[in-house]
A protein has these predicted regions:
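Charged, low-complexity intrinsically disordered segments
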Residues: 2-193
Length: 193
């Protein structure tokens, strides 16, 4: 298993979200780029989130920071402009939470819930997507298969785990996501206040 792969985490800790899905492409709204239609669904979309008085420019930055408890990586990721995922990779091998695999989906559910509660535009777009399947389209990625969050187009279907799309549809259809995070899930915030 690659240190950065989350597939084993999902299979072991979140079996209800494990496995490949297939969706007819003509029934899907696709998350592809933040400046395209449905781009607000991307975790990289600029929908600021405030948690305990700390503002995050994107839900992706908040999610990436939840991987850490130590001051140095937290400050580096928070203050570095651009893609927080790339900055995070630098710190993960030496500083990632030991229990990250056990909380990864709950952390994403928290981030999406905050985005839902704090962004009217996000809620409106979720409502507008009713009746459609939401997918994170990774067809343009160079690797053969999509990662756990997305799908790739194969003939007339989007195929892949589609975790992000599935969580967004669950949030859209129920108005909430249930999550369970450890007491120390937000210790990183103390370095940002």
């Amino acid at each position: 298993m690659s240190f950065y792969s989350i597939s084993d985490f999902i299979r072991e800790n979140y079996p209800e979200y494990w496995g490949m899905q297939s969706y007819p492409a003509n029934q899907c709204v696709r998350i592809h780029k933040i400046d395209e239609e449905w781009g607000i669904f991307s975790n990289f979309g600029h929908t600021p989130i405030v948690v305990e008085g700390v503002t995050f420019d994107t839900s992706e930055r908040l999610f990436q920071l939840m991987k850490f408890k130590d001051e140095e990586p937290v400050k580096a990721i928070y203050y570095k402009k651009g893609n927080p995922k790339m900055t995070t990779k630098h710190w993960e091998k030496t500083h990632r939470r030991e229990d990250w695999g056990e909380i990864i989906i709950d952390a994403m559910k928290f981030c999406l819930t905050q985005k839902y509660e704090q962004s009217e535009a996000f809620r409106q777009e979720l409502e507008r997507s009713k009746g459609k399947i939401i997918v994170e389209d990774q067809s343009g990625f160079t690797k053969k298969n999509p990662d756990a969050w997305g799908v790739k187009l194969q003939d007339d279907n989007f195929v892949g785990p589609n975790l992000l799309g599935r969580l967004l549809m669950e949030l859209r259809d129920t108005g909430k996501l249930e999550y369970d995070l450890p007491d120390d899930a937000f210790t990183f915030l103390r370095y940002l206040k």
